[in-house]
Regions:
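Short secondary-structure junctions
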Residues: 25-27, 134
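A short, mixed-charge helix-start or loop-turn motif at secondary-structure junctions
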Residues: 1-5, 109, 149-156
Length: 187
């Protein structure tokens, strides 16, 4: 297996395990508690990740089944590499700048189900399986269109990097929520 892909799959597995350990025991009330009206709850962080990741699953399926069609945007030289690097850098948790989620990927505003962490872990297994299934492909040369914005393109490998860095960013955001003064005590 490609070493970089193996590392990303391992990191995705760690995120799933850590999510289960850190947030799996939270009550529905705790999952839905928001530090401020304009801030996300733990549940919303994971709802957002699931919504975002679900946009990638059919794209990866199309690649695996040979149904991927190249768009005009994907054929522009240098654009996929530029977009990939830009998104990976901007989504890195070390970047203090907040980024507004695209409308299609905003989390639910109502109560999030108490099963959100288990649902995320289950979806993460699907994501990891899809990643493994592409191990024999040239992931740097396969260009996909972002599920968030049609003109944005990047390699499938960069898509995997984006998924993992995005998950780390929102995992840390969820950690900050439970560390916030006023977070409800467990039962």
């Amino acid at each position: 297996m490609n070493e970089a892909l193996g590392t990303l799959i391992s990191q995705a597995g760690t995120i799933a395990n850590d999510a289960r350990q850190v947030f799996g025991g939270l009550s529905t009330q705790q999952l839905n508690w928001k530090p401020a009206p304009d801030r996300w709850s733990v549940g919303q962080c994971f709802d957002h990740l699931m919504t975002t990741n679900s946009g990638y699953l059919p794209v990866i399926d199309d690649v695996l089944q040979g149904r991927k069609k190249s768009s005009v945007w994907q054929k522009l030289p240098f654009m996929p590499r530029l977009w990939g690097k830009l998104l990976i850098k901007s989504l890195d948790p070390s970047q203090a700048r907040k980024i507004k989620a695209p409308k299609a990927f905003e989390p639910a505003q109502s109560d999030i189900s108490g099963s959100i962490i288990n649902d995320f872990v289950a979806q993460q297994s699907q994501v990891m399986e899809k990643m493994k299934a592409t191990e024999n492909l040239d992931l740097e040369r396969i260009v996909i269109t972002s599920p968030a914005a049609t003109p944005v393109t990047y390699s499938l490998m960069d898509a995997y990097r984006i998924i993992v860095v995005h998950e780390r960013r929102h995992f840390q955001q969820a950690q900050r929520v439970i560390e916030t003064s006023g977070f409800p005590a467990g039962n």
